[in-house]
Swiss-Prot record:
MF-aspect GO terms: ATP binding; tRNA dimethylallyltransferase activity
Recorded family membership: Belongs to the IPP transferase family.
Gene name per UniProt: miaA
S-S pairs: none
Ligand binding (substrate): T18, A19, S20, G21, K22, T23
Key words of the record: ATP-binding, Magnesium, Nucleotide-binding, Transferase, tRNA processing
Gene3D superfamilies: 1.10.20.140, P-loop containing nucleotide triphosphate hydrolases
Region entry Interaction with substrate tRNA, spans: 41-44
Upper classification of the organism: Bacteria, Bacillati, Bacillota, Bacilli, Bacillales
Site (Interaction with substrate tRNA): S107, R130
Assigned EC number: 2.5.1.75
SUPFAM superfamilies reported for this sequence: P-loop containing nucleoside triphosphate hydrolases
Organism: Lysinibacillus sphaericus (strain C3-41)
Name by which UniProt lists this protein: tRNA dimethylallyltransferase
Assembly mode: Monomer.
Length: 300
């Protein structure tokens, strides 16, 4: 049944939390179904964010073409709307060459925005309101700002990690400007599929203990492979207050480099935040997406 769906699909997406086995499955399917892989991770678009985002290496690609990796400077902003436009263009290009586009990543909203009729309007910006929120953040801290959003828009707050202060503040800003919550604005979007697609999911059938152990071991391996040095390179360039360094792995080690915590404390936070994010990802995939979950390592 799954093989028939794969053969009929115009586009395949593979979603799953970190350390769930997406890379191995994507390479297997690309080889079997004449596919090319499109990055579906919102942070792997940045140059220099390689180890912390678990970006695939040339060796791991095994000759399979990969697209939309490492094409933006760390200081650049990149929205879901930007991603949607680029990926739809890339899908058309891959299909024109009679190959199968395979989107791979953990950013569920980004994948949905491509596959369904999500429409994005030009968002208003009020610099004074934004600065006021950042001033409030400096005084009260991330948790207090997230609690404020939770009181006003619990649905949106649930989807945003408290440490992702850029998104928390943007959600508060949208509420102030329009009076409409981000969640409510999105409710009537994204219901009509634009492609005959199949979304495969990993991690759902893995026990929480196994997944968390894989995540902890992956963090240890990242540190062995030079994650601290990678983050230090960004920190020394004084890259701050931008989207890229909100990624898990970067903000925790920035705290260490800023002298706010020990290295051990930063690594513990990195592991904890990675586990929490994996839990939120799985909840999102289950509740917000029509995902066909498969076993990690299952032959398709």
């Amino acid at each position: 049944m799954i093989e028939n769906k794969l053969q009929q699909a115009e586009v395949v997406a593979i979603v799953g939390p970190t350390a769930s086995g997406k890379t191995a499955l994507s390479i297997e399917l690309a080889k079997k179904y004449n596919g090319e892989i499109i990055n579906g991770d919102s942070m792997q678009v940045y140059k220099g964010l390689d180890i912390g985002t678990a970006k695939i290496t040339e060796e791991e690609m095994e000759g399979v073409p990969h697209h939309l990796l490492s094409f933006l400077e760390p200081t650049a902003s990149f929205s879901v709307a930007d991603y949607q436009k680029l990926v739809r263009e890339k899908i058309a290009d891959i299909q024109a060459r009679h190959k199968l586009p395979i989107i791979v990543g953990g950013s569920g909203l980004y994948v949905q925005a491509v596959l369904f009729d999500f429409q994005f309007t030009d968002e208003k910006v009020d610099e004074a309101a934004r600065q006021a929120y950042y001033d409030e953040l400096a005084k009260l801290g991330p948790e207090a700002m997230h609690d404020k959003l939770k009181q006003l828009d619990p649905q949106t707050a649930e989807a945003i990690h408290p440490n992702n202060t850029r998104r928390v503040i943007r959600a508060l800003e949208m509420l102030e400007l329009s009076g409409v919550s981000k969640a409510a604005e999105a409710q009537n979007r994204g219901e009509v599929p634009l492609y005959n697609h199949l979304i495969l999911g990993l991690g759902q059938n893995m026990s929480r203990e196994v997944l968390y152990d894989r995540i902890n071991r992956r963090v240890d391996l990242m540190m062995e492979n030079g994650l601290l040095e990678e983050v230090q390179g960004l920190w020394q360039q004084n890259i701050r207050g931008v989207q890229s360094i909100q990624a898990i792995g970067y903000k925790e080690l920035y705290d260490y480099l800023d002298g706010k915590c020990s290295l051990e404390g930063a690594i513990d936070s990195l592991k904890q935040n990675s586990r929490r994010y994996a839990k939120r990802q799985l909840t999102y995939f289950r509740n917000k997406m029509d995902v066909h979950f498969v076993m990690t390592g299952e032959q398709l």
